[in-house]
Regions:
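Bacterial N-terminal signal peptides
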Residues: 7-16
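N-proximal helix/coil linker or "cap" segments that precede and/or mark the start of modular domains
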Residues: 15-35, 170-185
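Thiol/disulfide oxidoreductase modules built on the thioredoxin-like
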Residues: 106-112, 119-165
């Protein structure tokens, strides 16, 4: 490979790394979650994170080649199945090369309640500074990061469920009936 070609690739990369050298890393608990726009890879519906304010969002970064990630997705699917999408949305952002086809993932996610978010060029993963997989952010109703989980194991499920329950808060009061029963004396 010609030396000029190597340097033409390494110099910009080195500059980008140096620019981020002093950064604290990704967003932290309490920070406003970095916004993104994308689409659901299965339904092709637009997704705009900031439009989810008022809902709890589980945002997980994963890869099909990552064994813990493959174990985490069914757990998140069961979680989404138990809570209405009016209250909670679960987004799975695949971490893969831009040229990898989404077709096999779409086939898997068609049968799941979890939303497969397209991130072909890694821009969403870049905003969150993903450095390990799976990497999950729990975003509260106010748009702030309520919890962060790196890695996955069976022992992490209770903590994740507790964090989601805390973010959801107490169950909302039931809507008043159209014809309330008469008061008893």
């Amino acid at each position: 490979m010609p030396r000029w070609l190597v340097w033409s690739v390494l110099l910009p990369l080195g500059g980008a790394l140096a620019a981020h050298a002093g950064d604290k890393g990704g967003p932290a608990v309490g920070d406003i979650a970095p916004d993104f726009k994308s689409w659901d890879a299965v339904t092709h519906e637009r997704i705009h994170l900031s439009e989810q304010t008022g809902k709890v969002v589980v945002l997980t970064f994963w890869a099909s080649w990552c064994a813990p990630c493959r174990r985490e997705i069914p757990v998140l699917d069961r979680l989404q199945s138990k809570v209405s999408k009016d209250q909670l949305v679960v987004y799975a952002v695949p971490f893969q090369a831009p040229d990898q086809a989404y077709g096999p993932l779409v086939k898997i996610f068609r049968s799941l309640k979890v939303t497969l978010v397209e991130d072909r060029y890694g821009s969403i993963a870049g905003r969150y500074r993903i450095d390990s997989l799976p990497h999950l952010f729990l975003i509260g109703r106010d748009g702030r990061i309520a919890a962060e989980h790196k890695g996955y194991g069976e022992g992490s499920i209770p903590e994740l469920v507790a964090d989601v329950n805390a973010a959801l808060g107490p169950a909302p009061a039931p809507a008043p009936a159209d014809n309330p029963p008469p008061a008893e004396h």
